[in-house]
Amino acid sequence: MRPSEKQDNLVRAFKALLKEERFGSQGEIVEALKQEGFENINQSKVSRMLTKFGAVRTRNAKMEMVYCLPTELGVPTVSSSLRELVLDVDHNQALVVIHTGPGAAQLIARMLDSLGKSEGILGVVAGDDTIFITPTLTITTEQLFKSVCELFEYAG
């Protein structure tokens, strides 16, 4: 087998394992890949692959912290899976703040950014699990807060 074929097979197996959303550590991924026949795999290679493919740690359906791959490269739309990532929405006189599951803030912020000024969003800043949203001058923070809560079906 050519080296490029081996690499392609490794990438396919790696992505398939992460889609299972059951691996909480890099060591678990290494062991699973070894069971798939990739004898020369190690933790540092898995770490590089996680970074290369933009993997994040988030909670699965069993509420376990696991590695997973971002599902969409384009601008995401609101779906039930995005709604589940929003843990809390709050606001003050200046900002609306969203708390998400670990690693989910960037994904949700990109979706909010795509809504833009037409929805009253002047700007969005996201960290790993926190998003700050600033309203435009044409909307109050309270109105933006209510819109964001509706968007994510957040009852708060």
Curated annotation (Swiss-Prot):
Q: Where in the cell is it found?
A: Cytoplasm
Q: Which domain of life is it from?
A: Bacteria
Recorded family membership = Belongs to the ArgR family.
InterPro entries, sorted: Arg_repress, Arg_repress_C, Arg_repress_C_sf, Arg_repress_DNA-bd, WH-like_DNA-bd_sf, WH_DNA-bd_sf
Give the protein's recorded name.
Arginine repressor
Q: Which Pfam families match?
A: Arg_repressor, Arg_repressor_C
Query: What gene, per UniProt, encodes this protein?
Result: argR
Provide the disulphide bond pattern. Answer: none
NCBIfam families membership? argR_whole, PRK05066.1
Kindly indicate whether the keyword tRNA processing belongs to this entry.
no
Keywords, comma-separated and alphabetical: Amino-acid biosynthesis, Arginine biosynthesis, Cytoplasm, DNA-binding, Repressor, Transcription, Transcription regulation
Q: Where are the transmembrane segments?
A: none
Question: So what does this one do?
Answer: Regulates arginine biosynthesis genes.
KW Plastid (keyword) present: no
Single Gene Ontology BP annotation: regulation of arginine biosynthetic process
In which pathway is this protein known to take part? Amino-acid biosynthesis; L-arginine biosynthesis [regulation]
Q: Which organism is it from?
A: Vibrio vulnificus (strain YJ016)
* Gene Ontology cellular-component annotations: cytoplasm
A GO MF annotation of the entry reads: arginine binding
